[in-house]
Amino acid sequence: KEQIKKLITIFPEGQVVIIVDDKIVGCALSIIVNYNMVKGDHTYAQVTGNETFNTHDPNGNILYGIEVFIHPDYRGLRLARRMYEYRKELCEKLNLKAIMFGGRIPNYHKYADKMRPKEYIEHVRNREIYDPVLTFQLSNDFHVRRVIRNYLPSDEESEHCATLLQWDNIYYQPPTDSYVDRKPTVRIGLVQWQM
């Protein structure tokens, strides 16, 4: 509860909650980070600053998904999809480059003795294997950038693996330097003749 309050304080528009009959039935939490922080291997603890969220950078260029949950009684109503649509709209509105997050692969433990994570992801992508998390993410236009090991050390179902997922904002406009900010490069060549 305290963590959600902090997120609402530092980045209110990044937090979305679905309430039905005065009961929270779903939420999506996110922060803004710089791409360099999350492009390679990282853990949930690192990206969240051990859940202090001091890693939130309003000047960053990535909307990073911290958590999404839907109460079991309300699954199948496309509520998670609506929250993801909100995140995409927010990403476009804030002119952020992409949405990224570490996604669990909870059915991987059933296949870990037969295939590596890369093969498992391919089977899920080809709809030969169903994974409740990854199948949903792929159907929402996210793509797998890489496998992250030990993203959530306690996630035994995923065999301590996660997928780094990304959705690219096709409307993203990189910031342009103003004329004042430019530092021109001047090259001077000198030749000295001895006579």
Predicted regions and their residues:
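Hydrophobic structural segments
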Residues: 176-195
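Conserved beta-hairpin
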Residues: 14-28, 43-44
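C-terminal/domain-terminus segments
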Residues: 1, 82-90, 146-176
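Short loop/turn motifs at secondary-structure junctions and domain boundaries
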Residues: 6-11
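Glycine-rich phosphate/pyrophosphate-binding loop shared by adenosine-nucleotide-utilizing enzymes
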Residues: 23-27, 63, 186
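Conserved acetyl-CoA-binding loop-helix of GNAT-fold acetyltransferases
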Residues: 70, 76-92, 98-101
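Conserved acyl-donor/pantetheine-binding loop and adjacent beta-alpha core of acyl/acetyltransferases
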Residues: 28-67, 82-85, 104-132, 138, ...
